[in-house]
């Protein structure tokens, strides 16, 4: 009895020590990943605040010693006197992104709800086409998209950046999976009470689908805000360029050395909206990713 009594506390201490060591290694790994992921963002913030004499100092500095907002001032004032002001690029990105997100949410939710709850003729083949579309990269469909947009005479317009991204297969599939969890008993009860279909969709289905369409909105915002390839293909006018193309314009050409601080500020302004949107909506995104279905 004495031997067993002495052995159990010792084994318990070894277990606690082993558990503490494994947890320490886990935290160490997570901290390393945070540093690796956060270091580029930290360098970007410092570079946007660095005066010109610190940007080209040798050896290079990661941490800014004399922070200044001069780079942002030059970006929004000095460059605004050029042919296309930088604020125009911000407006182009904001307008095309917001319009795309709003239309995409409505179209994908309506399409998925109608396909799942009303089951029209050919709903099976339609869903099969959506699944097949998930297998292709967006770059594969750029040439067909360009041919369609060119046929509609929408090249070099805002609609060229909006229409091809309205009905994305992944967004449709995401909402469709949530629509399958909508309890039919609630919808039937509303119909028995005399509710019209548009009322059922907007007042009952959409609130229940909020985790799905908020996640759709976040993904759509981030993808469209950071999209470089589509504006490069569809847009040739400087007045219609978005922020990713504006960064390319600022980073090259004559006087690029003098604009280095402004380029850092432009990079900061381009990156921050995506981070803020995801940080604000991360709760809904995590809820959707965990697929917390609606119980009847």
PLM regions with names:
Residues 2-296:
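A hydrophobic, multi-pass inner-membrane permease signature
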């Amino acid at each position: 009895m004495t031997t067993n009594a002495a052995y159990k506390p010792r084994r318990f201490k070894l277990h606690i020590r082993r558990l503490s060591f494994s947890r320490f290694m886990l935290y160490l790994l997570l901290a390393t990943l945070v540093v690796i992921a956060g270091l580029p963002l930290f360098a970007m913030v410092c570079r946007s605040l660095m005066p010109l004499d610190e940007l080209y100092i040798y050896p290079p500095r990661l941490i800014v010693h004399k922070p200044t907002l001069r780079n942002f001032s030059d970006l929004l004032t000095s460059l605004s006197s050029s042919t296309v002001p930088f604020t125009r690029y911000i407006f182009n990105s904001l307008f095309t992104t917001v319009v795309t997100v709003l239309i995409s949410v409505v179209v994908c939710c309506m399409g998925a709800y109608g396909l799942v709850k009303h089951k029209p003729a050919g709903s099976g083949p339609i869903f099969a086409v959506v699944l097949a579309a998930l297998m292709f990269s967006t770059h594969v469909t750029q040439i067909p998209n360009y041919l369609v947009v060119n046929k509609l005479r929408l090249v070099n317009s805002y609609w060229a950046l909006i229409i091809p991204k309205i009905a994305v297969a992944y967004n449709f599939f995401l909402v469709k999976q949530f629509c399958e969890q909508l309890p039919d008993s609630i919808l039937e009860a509303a119909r028995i009470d005399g509710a019209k279909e548009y009322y059922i969709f907007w007042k009952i289905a959409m609130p229940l689908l909020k985790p799905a369409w908020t996640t759709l909105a976040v993904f759509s915002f981030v993808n469209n805000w950071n999209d470089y390839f589509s504006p490069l293909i569809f847009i040739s006018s400087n007045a219609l360029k978005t922020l990713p193309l504006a960064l390319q314009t600022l980073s090259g050409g004559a006087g690029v050395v003098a604009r280095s601080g402004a380029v850092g500020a432009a990079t900061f302004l381009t990156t921050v909206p995506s981070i803020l949107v995801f940080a604000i909506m991360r709760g809904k995104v995590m809820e959707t990713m965990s697929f917390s279905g609606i119980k009847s």
